[in-house]
């Protein structure tokens, strides 16, 4: 990429892939798991790699440096050239990913998906800012995710009870980040 002075530029897009516009010329390795925007389970890793990133993985492989097979990019590259994976992913992961990609492509591709994510996140954050008992977890609008929105609730409102009601009505995966211990939904 321009301005990288030969250094590889890697982008961890796990929470963004499929919900933000992408210019592959600006990174050497854009990698993600197909959860979030792709409506799939974790456990599968995907990457768009430049020739420079592939060459670096091959250079490491022939250097004799020990890398566990699970982390060896050259194995992933070799398998991808054979349309295979090193470990067999759950079939549901592949089906969910394929269905989501079909839906995205049918509606206009990545531009559609990014626009839809932007619109949805704007609605969520605008609602949270205007409502007396909610606030966006990330207060700086420039730093907020357009793919995963997290909303704090006033302490006298039980966010876990809201999540339970949402789940009973078919809206799933809204539970808060447990490690934060906050009264929130995402």
What are these regions (language model features)?
Residues 1-24:
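Catalytic PLP-binding core of fold-type I/II PLP enzymes
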Residues 4-7, 25-27, 41-44, 182:
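Short coil/turn connectors at secondary-structure junctions
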Residues 10, 24-35:
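Conserved active-site segment immediately N-terminal to the catalytic lysine
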Residues 11-13, 33-34, 165, 174:
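Short His-Asn-centered micro-motif
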Residues 129, 133-186:
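Conserved C-terminal alpha-helix-loop-beta "cap" of PLP-dependent enzymes
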